[in-house]
Each structure stands twice: as structure tokens, then as C-alpha cells.
Regions:
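A contiguous, mid-domain pocket- or channel-lining segment that forms the substrate-recognition surface
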Residues: 2-142
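Surface-exposed acidic, glycine-flexible loop patches that form ligand/cofactor-binding
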Residues: 32-35, 176-178, 243-252
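Structural recognition of the beta-strand scaffold that forms the well-ordered cores
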Residues: 40-44, 183-188, 209, 257-260
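Flexible loop/turn segments at secondary-structure boundaries
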Residues: 49-51, 192-197, 267
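A long, amphipathic alpha-helix that forms part
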Residues: 103-107, 115, 212-253
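Extended, H/D-rich, highly charged conserved domains that either
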Residues: 117-197
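Contiguous alpha-helical scaffold segments within structured protein domains
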Residues: 188-227
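Single conserved hydrophobic/aromatic residue that forms the stacking wall/gate
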Residues: 264-275
């Protein structure tokens, strides 16, 4: 399916409704850095669609609201340390109960139901790992963020303001790298079926709609404008990495970036699409 390439863009698995996905490369990288950062990796996506998949090929939910990303990365949970310890202990007890009940059910299920249960248990185990990591990092304070940066980044940005939205998300990524709170991000800026229109440059069609151009010069012009706009937002991210320094120097010198798409346009006459 030409529209379903996004889930396998970072996994290299076979695409298709019945195919099983694999782990995405960002997660393999995140595993290597996990002991050194509060968050091994973060998945972002403007439509909520993700590029990140765990070792069982299950999608890792992507956050799409800048304010929620800021809160997760840079805001300490309310109630102080002792309240946080109680909440984490409570979460751990609930997870133990859920896993225990699930194991009992597993002995009574058929193969198809067991497969669904395995996927559910994988999600539960991931929550368990995150809970354990949160406990490990509980006594380590989060980085202090200036008031000006907080005002700039801890806010809702309407997705209709596409440029501001993308730049805010990119700024959050740069700040996370600068403070070393995580070293791995994925950011889905629009998949084959849901690329957003860009009103600020008078493009009211989605990129998916524009890709059905059938050689029409006007549609091709608009498609080019859409792509240039998206490349400019990514260039902003690269510029910010070049401007900001941490203890090792400019962030750009210690950052690897991959940008691309899994489908050029739907009018390709063959299924041999470029990555």
C-alpha cells in the first residue's frame, strides 16, 4: 500500500496490513543511551502518528502538543518527592496485579487471543520499565528552564500555524539535547495520508492531495512549495543546533539527523519509490 509506508520507514520491515512490524532504529539507539539520560527516547508527531516501534513491532505513541512535551520533559510532577514516590509505588503495585492476572488468562486462551494478550503485556511491561526508570531518576533534579524559554515553549500552538508549530517542536528538541534530558527524538511531520495544508503560504490542500497531480503544472508548483516549506522548517532545526552549545561544543557537531519521506508522490508509475 503506497499510503502505508510510514510505519516501516525506520524499521525496514515489510509493509502491509497483515505484515508484522519490527523495531525502529531510533529505539535501538535509545537503548544504548538509556543509562545516561532521564528519557531514552521521545516520539513526536503532528497528527499523533508515530515513527517509533518497539522490539515487538508495536507503535510507541507520539506526543503532538508542545505544552505536553514541555511538561513531560521539564516539569516536575506536583506534590513533591514523597508524593511522587507514593504514586510510583502505587503504579508498580497495579502493574504487578495486572501482569499476574494476565498470566492466568494466558493459560486459558487460544493462539490468536494469546497474540493479542502478548501485545497488551508488552505495553504493560513498557510502563513498568518507565516506572522503574522514574524511580531511579526521582532524586535527580530536572534542568532549570528560564522564564523566557518557558513562555516560548510551554504553550499551545494551533496546527493551522504550521511554521510556528514545527519551529516550537524543533526548539523543544534542541532544548532537550542541550540539557541532555534525552538524546533521541523522532518527529513525524505528516504521513502520506495526513500531511497538513499550509494556510500561511496559501496552500489549502494537503500534501497527499497535491501528490495526486497527474502532471498538472499548477499542482506540481504547489507540491514544490509545500516541500520547500517543510525543508525550510527542518533547516531551522539545523540552524538552531548550530547556534546552541553544550559542554562539548555546538550541538550540531554531536548530533546525527535523518530527514526524508517514504513516498515522493502517488503518481509514480511503479512501486519503486525513493527513500
Amino acid at each position: 500500500d503506497r499510503h502505508g509506508c510510514q510505519p516501516v520507514w525506520l524499521t525496514g520491515a515489510q509493509a502491509g496490513p497483515t505484515a508484522r512490524n519490527s523495531v525502529s532504529i531510533d529505539q535501538l539507539i535509545a537503548q544504548q543511551h538509556a543509562p545516561n539520560t532521564r528519557f531514552p527516547g521521545i516520539a513526536l508527531g503532528n497528527t499523533g502518528r508515530t515513527l517509533s516501534y518497539n522490539e515487538d513491532g508495536i507503535a510507541i505513541p507520539a506526543e503532538k502538543k508542545p505544552s505536553e512535551v514541555f511538561k513531560r520533559l521539564f516539569t516536575s510532577p506536583e506534590g513533591g518527592l514523597e508524593q511522587q514516590r507514593k504514586e510510583l509505588k502505587k503504579t508498580g503495585s497495579i502493574l504487578d496485579l495486572v501482569l499476574g492476572e494476565a498470566r492466568k488468562l494466558n493459560r486459558e486462551m487460544g493462539n490468536e487471543d494469546k497474540s493479542r494478550l502478548d501485545q497488551y503485556l508488552t505495553s504493560v511491561r513498557e510502563v513498568e520499565v518507565r516506572t522503574e526508570r522514574a524511580e531511579d531518576w526521582l532524586d535527580i533534579p530536572r534542568p532549570r528552564i528560564s522564564e523566557s524559554q518557558t513562555r516560548k515553549l510551554n504553550r499551545e500552538v494551533p496546527q493551522q500555524e504550521v511554521g510556528d508549530y514545527f519551529r516550537t517542536m524543533y526548539d523543544l528538541m534542541v532544548l532537550a539535547f542541550e540539557t541532555d534530558i534525552t538524546r533521541v527524538f523522532t518527529f513525524s511531520t505528516g504521513d502520506e495520508g495526513k500531511g497538513l495544508p499550509i494556510p500561511e503560504i496559501n496552500l489549502n490542500q494537503t500534501r497527499h492531495s497535491l501528490s495526486h497531480h497527474n502532471g498538472d503544472p499548477e499542482q506540481l508548483r504547489r507540491l514544490t512549495e509545500s516541500d520547500i516549506f517543510n525543508y525550510e522548517q527542518f533547516a531551522y532545526f539545523i540552524d538552531r543546533l548550530s547556534q546552541v552549545e553544550d559542554e562539548h561544543g555546538k550541538l550540531i557537531d554531536s548530533t546525527q539527523c535523518l530527514y526524508g519521506l517514504s513516498l515522493i508522490h502517488i503518481s509514480e508509475p511503479t512501486r519503486q519509490h525513493h527513500i
